[in-house]
């Protein structure tokens, strides 16, 4: 089993942990509905880049009639 020869200093420990931070997700505003959503993700209403991409059952029935 590997054993360290010398104790790591708090400075070196901090330098190692410098890259462990988590970034906050980036949000955008949809220009058709004005809704906030994550970048490159579909809005909760089913819009992506101004176009409806996910249709609910009710919307499918309305289009068929």
Curated annotation (Swiss-Prot):
Domain of life the protein comes from: Bacteria
InterPro entries, per the entry: Ribosomal_bL32, Ribosomal_bL32_bact, Ribosomal_zn-bd
Region named Disordered: 1-45
Keywords: Ribonucleoprotein, Ribosomal protein
Entry GO CC: large ribosomal subunit
Molecular-function GO terms, alphabetical: structural constituent of ribosome
GO biological process: translation
4Fe-4S as UniProt keyword: no
HAMAP family, A to Z: Ribosomal_bL32
Protein family per UniProt: Belongs to the bacterial ribosomal protein bL32 family.
Protein's UniProt name: Large ribosomal subunit protein bL32
Organism, as annotated: Nitrosococcus oceani (strain ATCC 19707 / BCRC 17464 / JCM 30415 / NCIMB 11848 / C-107)
């Amino acid at each position: 089993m590997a054993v360290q020869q010398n104790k790591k200093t708090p400075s070196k420990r901090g330098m190692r942990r410098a890259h462990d931070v988590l970034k906050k997700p980036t949000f955008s505003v949809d220009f058709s509905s004005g809704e906030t959503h994550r970048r490159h993700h579909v809005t909760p209403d089913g819009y992506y880049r101004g176009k409806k991409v996910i249709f609910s059952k009710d919307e499918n029935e309305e289009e068929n009639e």
